[in-house]
Curated annotation (Swiss-Prot):
This enzyme's EC code(s): 3.4.14.-
Species per Swiss-Prot/TrEMBL record: Aspergillus fumigatus (strain ATCC MYA-4609 / CBS 101355 / FGSC A1100 / Af293) (Neosartorya fumigata)
Coiled coil: none
Family of the protein in this entry: Belongs to the peptidase S9C family.
Name assigned to this protein: Dipeptidyl-peptidase 5
Active site (record annotation): 560 (charge relay system), 643 (charge relay system), 675 (charge relay system)
Tissue-level expression: Expressed in mycelia and conidia.
Length: 721
């Protein structure tokens, strides 16, 4: 490593260019920056896809926290995770195993001589989410998660016996979830110990891994598809493990209820929930989803979040602090705060908590006393962008990693009493693909909506000139309880759309998160009501107040609930205001909602089951005959085969109707994608077709010689007409 030089963050800078789909997809993607104990450097990973080689490469680097310069730590793409053991010592996961196909290895090395490390453990399957704690004797206790058989044995896909039949048989739901079919294997947290050797002898695995989850029937942690290392924690002394699992006694498809379990690291006892129905400290009436368990520095307390409602995935998260061994009711902390935080860390002295929460179109950091009363209002100390990870430095400041609408990676320091202290690195100052992007690319406004003021982002194109006019792109977010935030996305990136020659307006209508729970909750049984009214009022505001926006040649696009709303708009007066529409994975036929996997979602959104409240389901039906008769705007329909949340039949049904009605339309399908399109090659086609579609009908294709065209896609179009 000594041959590598520290590189200036501006070393790769080049001339500003519009953000093309190719640049968006191939721009380096960096992980959170994890500081070493001294606070001098931080380690992070980078991956980058190439359309020349059609491969992704990855490497690890060190970031100098004083100068902002970086240098490569290792180019070994098999290094999947890194944990600091000391200022120079590192424990890392090698994603391959020389002795066990499908297994992984743990290696110990020095940051100053990375290639000279040694193997400390050979693990029998694929594991990730490594967390460690050093004991007084110098041993390293660790936890990680992998797949498990019902008997607790780690599941290794490469060594598993392939069944002779492809049949699947189910006696209960779930049958499938997100993009996979459920089987008898499940996620589980495993514990192990690396024993410190004597003298010059290094660490080695002491005994076998222990499954901490499988002894609890029907438990699973982390919970797929989005669960990960934040679903469990290891106490600083290595004695205890806390993990989240959905309620084993309840039907998983009908309830969001989950508990936080506590178990000794050595698995000497079976895990027990601290907030289950029979737990002595369970707060009265609190039955919703639990999340993000985090031990205090001395290990005697455990912070976590929990929702109240047992069927509402977007209920407000409330912070709780449990005292280990206590049978008293677990107290809430700042329980009346009208925000829904989703990450938490203790300050080193154990007196204060730092939480991350959506707030007014950002993800901000807040501080609050660990014993704050319910009426306490946490104090924000970051502003723009979306903070995604944060670690304490020796001087009690925080090293924060985040993003913004104008950069996919932003590292800075902040402190509760001082706010943002120092910017260390930002991708738009490093990467040629993002060069020229900056805060001036965006603005925001509020307008009077259906019942309250509504927020909207404005994203400008390259070389924006307010004396000119640019066609409108109307972005509608999914969820429906979600938002457009000041954060980077490689799937729906408004800057990449704007740089075709548009102004993007991205409103946060009724149902949006981060603006108070009342706005979020108001979309229940109201999908085509207040949110649609908000969008109409937003369009009117833009038409009347933003002189640089050409609403006569505008287009609209949305995914998931945003796709539903595009389908709803197609049959509404607002649909006639647009030259083209793009609907990605949206619901179309009201009665088809019963085909989803997370039944709690639809049953909560529409106030009952499909058979008890069918009128509610049909109230906002884009496929109602009277609405279909209004369809007229050219429409691109995108739907993929592995989308089990909103099955592909929804998109096919919509396309059938559009074709039968003679509306210009196209169907884009990916057999290997789910609710999202993430494969780089597929993502490129997705962008070419979505942007090409709107460019064709808005007139941008003719006015901008560099605009994306439908003809850019090399995949042949099937057209029997």
């Amino acid at each position: 490593m000594g041959a590598f030089r520290w590189l200036s963050i501006a070393a790769a800078a080049s001339t500003a260019l519009a953000l093309t789909p190719e640049q968006l997809i191939t721009a380096p993607r960096r992980s959170e920056a994890i500081p070493d104990p001294s606070g001098k450097v931080a380690v992070f990973s980078t991956s980058q896809y190439s359309f020349e080689t059609h491969k992704r490469t990855s490497w690890w680097s060190l970031l100098d926290l004083k100068t902002g310069q970086t240098k490569v730590l290792t180019n070994d793409s098999s290094v999947s995770e890194i944990v600091w053991l000391s200022d120079d010592s590192i424990l890392y996961v090698n994603s391959t195993n020389a002795d066990i196909p499908g297994g992984v290895e743990l290696w110990v090395t020095q940051a100053s001589s990375f290639a000279k490390g040694y193997k400390a453990a050979s693990l029998p399957a694929s594991f990730s989410g490594l967390k460690t704690a050093k004991t007084k004797s110098g041993d390293i206790r660790f936890v990680a998660y992998g797949q498990s058989y019902p008997n607790g044995t780690a599941y290794n896909e490469e060594l598993a016996t392939a069944p002779l039949s492809s049949a699947r048989i189910y006696d209960s739901i779930y049958v499938r979830h997100w993009d996979y079919w459920l089987s008898t294997t499940f996620n589980a947290v495993f514990s192990g110990t690396l024993k410190k050797g004597h003298g010059k002898n290094g660490y080695s695995l002491d005994g076998e891994l222990k499954n901490l989850v499988s002894p609890v029937k029907n438990a699973e942690s982390p919970y797929p598809p989005f669960g990960g290392a934040s679903d469990y924690d290891l106490s600083p002394d290595g004695k205890w493990v806390a993990f989240k699992s959905k309620a084993p006694e309840l039907p998983k498809a009908n309830f969001t209820t989950s508990y936080i379990y506590l178990v000794p690291h050595d698995a000497s006892e079976t895990a027990r929930p601290i907030n289950g129905p029979d737990s002595p400290g369970t707060p009265k009436g609190i039955k919703g989803d639990s999340s993000s368990p985090v031990f205090s520095p001395n290990g005697d307390k455990l912070a976590y979040f929990q929702m109240r409602d047992e069927t509402y995935e977007s209920d407000r998260r409330v912070l709780y602090v449990y005292s280990l061994g206590s049978k008293k009711t677990i107290p809430s902390v700042a329980g009346d705060w009208d925000r829904s935080p989703d990450s938490v860390k203790w300050t080193p002295d154990g007196k204060t908590l730092i939480v991350g929460s959506e707030d007014l179109g950002r993800t901000r950091l807040f501080s609050l006393p660990a014993n704050a009363k319910d009426d306490y209002k946490p104090k924000n100390f970051t502003d723009g962008g979306s903070a995604s990870a944060y670690y304490f430095l020796p001087d009690s400041s925080l090293l924060v990693t985040g993003s913004a609408l104008w950069t996919n990676w932003n590292v800075y320091t902040a402190k509760p009493e001082k706010g943002v202290i120092k910017k260390i690195a930002s991708a738009n100052e490093i990467d040629p693909e993002l060069k020229g992007l900056g805060p001036s690319d965006i603005s925001e406004f509020y307008f009077q909506g259906n019942f309250t003021d509504i927020h909207a982002w404005v994203i400008y194109p390259e070389n924006f000139d307010k004396s000119k006019k640019y066609p409108l792109i109307f972005f509608i977010h999914g969820g429906p309880q979600g938002n457009w935030a000041d954060g980077w996305s490689t799937r729906w990136n408004p800057k990449a759309w704007a740089d075709q020659g548009y102004v993007v307006v991205a409103p946060n209508p009724t149902g949006s998160t981060g603006f108070g729970q009342a706005l979020t909750d108001a979309i229940q049984n109201n999908w085509g009501g207040a949110p649609y009214d908000d969008l109409v009022k937003c369009w009117e505001y833009v038409h009347e107040n933003l002189d640089y926006v050409d609403t006569d040649h505008g287009v609209a696009a949305g995914a998931s609930y945003g796709g539903f709303m595009i389908n709803w708009i197609q049959g509404s007066p607002l649909g006639r205001k647009f030259k083209a529409l793009v609907s990605h994975d949206g619901t179309f036929v009201a009665d088809a909602k019963v085909s989803t996997e997370e039944l709690w979602f639809m049953q909560r959104e529409f106030n009952g089951t499909f058979w008890d409240a069918r009128d509610n389901y049909r109230r906002w039906d884009p496929s109602a005959p009277e609405r279909i008769l209004q369809f007229a705007t050219p429409m691109l329909v995108i739907h993929s085969d592995k989308d089990y949340r909103l099955p592909v039949a929804e998109g096919l049904s919509l396309f059938n109707v559009l074709q039968e009605r003679g509306v210009p339309s196209r169907f884009l399908n990916f057999p290997d994608e789910n609710h999202w399109v993430v494969n780089p090659e597929n993502s490129l086609v997705w962008h070419q077709q979505a942007l090409g579609w709107i460019n064709k009908y808005s007139g941008v294709e003719k006015s901008n010689p560099n605009a994306v065209s439908l003809e850019d896609t090399v995949v042949p179009v099937v057209n029997y007409n």
